[in-house]
Amino acid sequence: MPSPRLRFGVLGAADIALRRTVPALLAHPDVTVVAVSSRDTARAARFAAAFGCEAVPGHQALLDRDDIDALYVPLPVMVHTPWVEAALLRGRHVLVEKPLTATRSGAEDLIALARSRGLVLMENFTSLHHAQHGTVTDLLRDGTIGELRSLSAAFTIPPKPEGDIRYQPDVGGGALLDIGIYPLRAALHFLGPDLHAAGAVLRRERRRNVVVSGHVLLTTPHGVVAELAFGMEHAYRSEYTLFGTAGRLRLDRAFTPPETHRPRVEIHRQDALDIVDLPPDAQFANLVRDFVLAVREGPGRLTQHHADAVRQADLVERVMAVARVRWC
């Protein structure tokens, strides 16, 4: 007998939910989207009409429903904790936008609550679910560029409209939490968990008191270095390069590739360039698949996922602790 479909509620009619995540949820044969909530009833109604679900006025009303198994929470990071906690206390599985929280203690507390109740809590960090990074990892493991010496990663985007949530530091958290988290996570993925924050410069806009860009320097205990750049006042850039003793690997469109994108891994060696062409991959669909599997098979599948989320939050705090702020 097939398992019943997983009934999702969407806590917030965010743009990422509309464009990417909810279509991926609905494309999974074992998922249905029941309702969406928003403080803006007209926005919720438009969202619901687009996906054939019910519009609910206010997030608490969605939490109080009895026909929801899981909640997708695309709210701004600085309000994640109260709503994720409330959802877990109501017995709901939770898929929450990255980052889970802005602090290590906050991440640990939510993960502990989910585990104590046997519930799935997953961070919606979709780029981690794209197959291109596995290919790069395999090339590194095979010694394609010799011993790894450094990583350079950048994720930058053009300025957003004036009212964008990213410019509200007490809600959206600014560029470090929304954009800088991508190169930070790449450093954790390729260089391992024992990263030291050697320094950082954060460019903070005086008018809105929000971080709009930054550079971070990380090191491992063995001296491998990561140089990271991020921001929302630049031309678009989404890439990383791994430098080794015998060459370098470069990947463009590393963090937010569309489903139609055909990745190309560049392998640069002395006087030679090789290209590894990869097929398109649907990272949002992959994440939804993994979430459903965790619900069906048990949250024990997420032990490494949770450890990585805690390390990520810890690294963010350590970067902020050493950062020098430059006002603009």
Curated annotation (Swiss-Prot):
InterPro entries associated with the record: Gfo/Idh/MocA-like_OxRdtase_N (IPR000683), Gfo/Idh/MocA_domain (IPR050984), GFO_IDH_MocA-like_dom (IPR055170), NAD(P)-bd_dom_sf (IPR036291)
Binding positions (NADP(+)): 38-39, 75, 80, 166, 178
Record-level Gene Ontology MF annotations: nucleotide binding; oxidoreductase activity
Active site: 98 (proton donor)
EC number of this enzyme: 1.1.1.384
Catalytic activity: dTDP-4-dehydro-2,6-dideoxy-alpha-D-glucose + NADP(+) = dTDP-3,4-didehydro-2,6-dideoxy-alpha-D-glucose + NADPH + H(+)
Function according to Swiss-Prot or TrEMBL: Involved in the biosynthesis of one of the two 2,6-deoxysugars, dTDP-L-oleandrose, attached to the macrolactone ring oleandolide to produce the aglycone antibiotic oleandomycin. NADPH is the better reductant, however NADH can also be used.
Protein name (Swiss-Prot/TrEMBL): dTDP-3,4-didehydro-2,6-dideoxy-alpha-D-glucose 3-reductase
Source organism phylogeny: Bacteria, Bacillati, Actinomycetota, Actinomycetes, Kitasatosporales
